[in-house]
Curated annotation (Swiss-Prot):
Protein name: Protein FAM181B
Name of the gene encoding the protein in the UniProt record: FAM181B
Annotated InterPro entries: FAM181, TEADIR3_omega_loop
Pfam families (alphabetical): TEADIR3
Family in the record: Belongs to the FAM181 family.
Organism: Bos taurus
Region called Disordered, residue ranges: 107-157
Length: 419
């Protein structure tokens, strides 16, 4: 009956099955919808009286839940459809920042624009005077002349700042001895230093490198290149107020200067000359009472052996057991170990190993570390043996060789007798 009601009726909630004929079901559902949604304004008959065989409370509750669900779902769908998409506008941050910097620098370095011809260089300075002489000053015009006066004062302050900057960073034009400082102020205007545009270069040629002045071309004060003195940081020390690094290399002050650098610039060329002559104390002087005799100290604090050439160990690999020429140990003042201590042999060597042989002495010195590996007896130095080769040998696989020297391997292998 619910399927027939869904097919015949046009109401969307008919498939949720209410009894009765399709026409009566539609009318009853309409009355029920009015009853559940407009309970305060309900004036007709109640919905329970129109439905035959159905309980009014359950139907009203189910309809209310269904309508609230559809309402929330439709609102969510509408919000999702009306949500604006991601903006695809791309912002060029570099151009934006350049515009902002240009605007701010234009506000900070506000100066009168440069004249069109070199002969009219003094026109901005004469303009306020001419305006004051020719034009009468009525009351409304006086209110308009106040911003002009402020602009002229700002221009004068900017020109003063440009003179001070030109005296410090004068790399655009080298003024000869007879030139007046007014030409310097014209060559390096304030707008050219702050903004660097072509409109600011008044009375001088436009230089492309005017924005970034190299350090060597700036007229920096002498104190910028002065070395700080050693005596308490005051300029009255031995270095003097105008002494640079080049002056320190001359005369007797060079020795005093290099004495500050410590043993790094010593006269020795060996690596051992860079080490201090005094023994290095691991513990501070206050903890010397807690130390025991040197022979009872652990080996953790033993100093590293001295460098001999570029090798850490003086014995060459070809003669590990040979006697090495060693210097006698220098006696330490405090009885401790020094950095010039003679090297103790790391690997125990055989006493009768020859000095020029390559194999036996070296293998014998490594035998305590590989005690589980039994090495075959070493051959004479003149004879070349194949027992150490990577292939099969008679010593290692003696059971595969017959007394006549034939190979007893599987049939078909190389060296085996063919059947």
């Amino acid at each position: 009956m619910a399927v027939q009601a869904a097919l015949l009726s046009t109401h969307p909630f008919v498939p949720f099955g209410f009894g009765g004929s399709p026409d009566g079901l539609g009318g009853a559902f309409g009355a029920l919808e009015k009853g559940c949604c407009f309970e305060d304004e309900e004036t007709g008959t109640p919905a329970g009286a129109l439905l035959a065989g159905a309980e009014s409370g359950d139907a009203r509750e189910a309809t209310r839940d269904l309508l609230s669900f559809i309402d929330s779902a439709s609102s969510n769908i509408k919000l999702a459809l009306d949500k604006p998409g991601k903006s695809k506008r791309k912002v060029n941050h570099r151009k934006y920042l350049q515009k902002q910097i240009k605007r701010c620098s234009g506000l900070m370095g506000a100066a009168p624009p440069g004249p069109s011809s070199p002969g009219a260089a003094d026109t901005p300075a004469k303009r306020p005077l001419a305006g004051a002489q020719t034009v009468p000053v009525p009351v409304p015009a006086h209110g308009k002349a106040a911003p002009r006066r402020e602009a002229s004062q700002a221009a004068a302050a900017a020109s003063l700042q440009s003179r001070s900057l030109a005296a410090l960073f004068d790399s655009l034009r080298h003024v000869p001895g007879g030139a007046d400082p007014a030409g310097v102020a014209e060559a390096v205007p304030a707008a050219g230093l702050v903004r660097g545009d072509a409109a600011g270069s008044a009375g001088g040629p436009a230089v492309p490198g005017a924005r970034k002045v190299p350090l060597r071309a700036r007229n920096l004060p002498p104190s910028f290149f002065t070395e700080p003195s050693r005596a308490g940081g005051c300029v009255c020390g031995p270095s003097g107020p105008g002494v640079s690094l080049g002056d320190l290399e001359k005369g007797s002050e060079a020795a005093e200067f290099f004495e500050l650098l410590g043993p790094d610039y010593g006269a020795g060329t060996e690596a051992g000359a860079l080490l201090a002559a005094e023994p290095l104390d691991v513990f501070p002087a206050g903890a010397a009472v807690l130390r025991g005799p040197p022979e009872l100290e652990p080996g953790l604090f033993d100093p590293q052996p001295a460098m001999v050439g570029s090798l850490l160990y003086p014995e060459p690999w070809s003669a590990p057991g040979g006697p090495a020429t060693k210097k006698p140990p220098l006696p330490a003042p405090g009885g401790g170990l020094t950095l010039n201590e003679p090297l103790r042999s790391v690997y125990p060597a055989a006493a009768d190993s020859p000095g020029g042989d390559d194999g036996p002495g070296l293998l014998a010195s490594f035998t305590p570390f590989f005690s589980d590996c039994a090495l075959p007896p070493a051959p004479p130095p003149q004879q070349v043996s194949y027992d150490y080769s990577a292939g099969y040998s008679r010593t290692a696989f003696a059971g595969l060789w017959r007394p006549d020297g034939a190979w007893e391997g599987a049939p078909g292998e190389e060296g085996a007798p063919r059947d």
